Amino acid sequence: MTGLTGDITVGAALPPISKQFTLEMFKSDIATIHNDQAAAEAEGLPGPIAVGPQVAALIFRMAREAFGAGWIEGGKTSLTFRRPIPCDALCTAKGTVTGKKQEGEGTRVTCDVWVETADGEKTIVGTASGLVSGK
């Protein structure tokens, strides 16, 4: 079920989604930049970093909750990863409606979306859109 309808206004905020990442989430039998201090330092990083697609999944979850089936059946994204995220970061996906237009029997709602860390730094930025009922 979708939380948004076609009468959503430009400038409206999507409900944010937060997740506390931990090093344990990225553990495996192989030492990588995502789970091992020495491997991360060997690549010039200060420490292990989160797996980018796993962090971006916060945006996908936020969009699914906002658009419901309109995300599954017609969702679109374009994302840019701006910097590595420490593996122990608290990250929050946020979004703002930037436009809407009629598409078929519904409305395509376009949003600016991003993931930010607890200090407010945007680490992933982009756009997402989905279909909602109504005009």
Regions found by a protein language model. Give the residues of each.
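Hot-dog-fold acyl-thioester-processing enzymes
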Residues: 1-72
